[in-house]
Structures are given as C-alpha cells and as structure tokens.
Amino acid sequence: ILLPGRLTHWKGQKIFIETINLLYERKDIPPFEAIILGSDQGRNVYKKRLLGLVQQYRLNRIIKFIDRCEEMPVAYGIANLVCSCSSEPEAFGRVSVEAQSMGIPIVASDIGGSTETIVKDKTGFLFKSGDSNALTNAIIMVMQKDYNSLKSIGSEGRKNILKKFDVDKMCH
C-alpha cells in the first residue's frame, strides 16, 4: 500500500498510519506492507511524530518511510494499492491521476481534485476525509476483490486518465 506525497499534516500520513494499525490488528486480511513516500522538506518535527506513532503501534516492520524516488512509475509499479489521504482539498490531486494512469487502484479522500478525477467505484474509491475507519473499510474492500476485478479497476482508471488528459485536451 503506497502513500506518496510530501510529509505535511494535511497530506494525511497520520490517518494513514492509524489505518495501517487498524488493518494490522485484523486477522481476516492477507499480510501487507505500507510505504510512505515523500520528503519532510525540513519538517523533521512532523516526521519524528509520525515515526513515534509507527513505533507506538509497533508497525516498524510494516510501514517503511522513503524520502524520495526519482522514478515514480517504479514506485507505483510495486504498489497493489495507492492511497491519497489529504485532509484539505487539493486543486488537482496528482496522486489520484498518477495511480490511475499506472493502472493501480486508488483510494482517496472525498475532497478536492480526486473527486473529479476518480469515477467512484469504477476507477477508484473515495472515503470520508479524516476518517480512519472509512479508509480502513475502503482498503479492506479493495483487498477482498479478486485479481480480475482489480485489473479491471486499474484498466478503467488508465482509460479514464488517457481520455481526460490527452495532449489535445491539455494543450489546445
């Protein structure tokens, strides 16, 4: 499970960690790992808080922090699921677009640009912003889908992005 984005409170890393803890406590889902990918851009106090939360929940073996990735397609390529947990509306919501363009299922908060780029339950899933239980339930729903359903969601997501953001529409 990948959460890309710079480390700042409104990108939702805290709720993501709380969600991973809720998922980890369950015994009815397959084992998983989570990656928080993004630079703290000098916000080391916030990163220390996040690392403390990971330690408090004993998730050190489950959640990995990666500061940067020069090749984001590679990061998306290793993910089975991408999350965008913003607690404040983003004008565009690049993570949702990038995940869909890579054919990876996306679970995103129901505010901002993601609501316009995701076709709900067809190219991705939306959860109530700031609600770790809603995010947990959305991730469980994705984890319980079969391989063909996930491939279909990924394929529909890619088609959606190619249709909405082709060169002619973006440059003319």
Task: Please place each PLM-identified region on the residue numbering.
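Acidic donor-binding loop of glycosyltransferase active sites
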Residues: 77-91, 104
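Conserved donor-binding/catalytic core segment of Leloir-type glycosyltransferases
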Residues: 1-11, 17-20, 35
